[in-house]
Curated annotation (Swiss-Prot):
Keywords: Cytoplasm, Lipid biosynthesis, Lipid metabolism, NAD, NADP, Nucleotide-binding, Oxidoreductase, Phospholipid biosynthesis, Phospholipid metabolism. It comes from Albidiferax ferrireducens (strain ATCC BAA-621 / DSM 15236 / T118) (Rhodoferax ferrireducens). NADPH binds at residues 11, 34, 116, 153, 268, 292, 294. The gene is gpsA. The active site is at residue 204. One of its GO terms (molecular function) is glycerol-3-phosphate dehydrogenase [NAD(P)+] activity. The lineage of its organism: Bacteria, Pseudomonadati, Pseudomonadota, Betaproteobacteria, Burkholderiales. This is Glycerol-3-phosphate dehydrogenase [NAD(P)+].
Length: 346
């Protein structure tokens, strides 16, 4: 299978490495970087120094920096790069998804994105969108879906056991993703509930900020468990309101990804919460991280979509108030604990 991974960040690099290293599959894999200088360094050193340092890139993994605007048949063009591909993986952050899908809109092979989050609203009159909603606007004819689940890039790159979910309404996309990435170290399940999988991937980032804050304030394991459990309830309520199946949130892309992102110190969103608990400003926390933490950008959109649908999400609302500087960390905790008693609802 010819696989092209578009985006040479940590996750794109790790997934390309995993597919290339699968001894049973014998895929032909190329990792595309937008930055030609980054591609040159990766080619020379066989290492993604910026995003995945210390991990060796095997000789069989192709590296490209073909210009997106070049659709010609020249040997080094983007058009030639994706010609004959069996699967295209979009490994950009959420903010770059729309532009990449526009470039791929005429493709007739399966396309899958890795980003987790909501696209920020494009105007005051619109709401932020999930990835499949962006695709419906930008490239409606694509056979597309997403690959999600609890997965730190570094562990996947090291070949540590991981389970993911391939989500799409198209069976051919699900089947292609399973065939591309299922391996002795990477187990891939299929799910046709693309809405549920995407909501889980987006909301867990916001909740991980809250859990990071909780742990940074040394509030204890009881508080952490309460946040994760009630956060899962918020995630499920929003997902069901958007058309997802409730049971999806008990799977890898819901509970699984939430637990990992909220408690694992490799989580960027958790690190934002920990930094805020230490007294850093949001800008300081983002700058010190050096990578995209999707929860920072998705939090407001999550709350806006919930409000539009009449869905109650107090934890997500507290995170937004914290990120906007409307509350201090201790005030956010007090606001959550001071809510009126209620029956437990999923």
């Amino acid at each position: 299978m010819k696989i092209i991974v578009l985006g040479a960040g940590a996750w794109g690099t790790a997934l390309a490495l995993s597919a290339c290293s699968n001894p049973a599959a014998r895929h032909t894999v190329t990792l595309w970087a937008r930055d030609a200088a980054q591609a040159a360094v990766m080619q020379a050193r066989r290492e993604n120094v910026r995003y995945l340092p210390g991990v060796n890139l095997p000789p069989a993994l192709g590296i490209s920096s073909a210009r997106l605007s070049d659709a010609s048949a020249a040997p080094d063009s983007f058009g030639r790069l994706i010609d004959g591909a069996d699967l295209l993986i979009v490994a950009t952050p959420m903010a770059g998804l729309r532009a990449m899908l526009a470039h791929l809109s005429a493709c007739r092979v399966p396309v899958a994105w890795l980003c987790k989050g909501f696209e920020v609203a494009r105007s005051l009159e619109t709401l932020g969108l999930l990835a499949h909603e962006v695709q419906a606007q930008e490239a409606p004819d694509l056979m597309a879906g997403g690959l999600s689940g609890p997965s730190f890039a570094l562990e996947v790159a090291r070949g540590q056991p991981t389970a993911l979910v391939a989500a799409s309404v198209h069976a051919v996309v699900r089947d292609t993703l399973v065939a591309a990435f299922h391996s002795p170290t990477l187990r891939v399940y299929a799910n046709d509930d693309i809405v549920g999988v995407e909501v889980g991937g987006a909301v867990k980032n916001v909740l991980a900020i809250a859990v990071g804050l909780c742990d940074g304030l040394n509030l204890g394991l009881n508080a952490r468990a309460a946040l994760i459990t009630r956060g899962l309830a918020e995630m499920t309520r929003l997902g069901v309101a958007l058309g997802a199946r409730a049971e999806t949130f008990m799977g890898l892309s819901g509970l699984g990804d939430l637990v990992l992102t909220a408690t694992g110190d490799l989580s960027r969103n958790r690190q934002i919460g920990l930094a805020l608990a230490r007294g850093q400003t949001l800008q300081q926390a983002v700058d010190s991280l050096g990578h995209v933490a999707e929860g920072v950008y998705s939090a407001r959109t999550v709350v806006q979509r919930a409000a539009y649908l009449g869905v109650e999400m107090p934890i997500a609302q507290a995170v937004v108030a914290l990120l906007d500087g409307q509350m201090k960390p201790v005030e956010a905790v007090a606001a959550l604990m001071g809510r009126d008693p209620a029956n437990e609802q999923p």
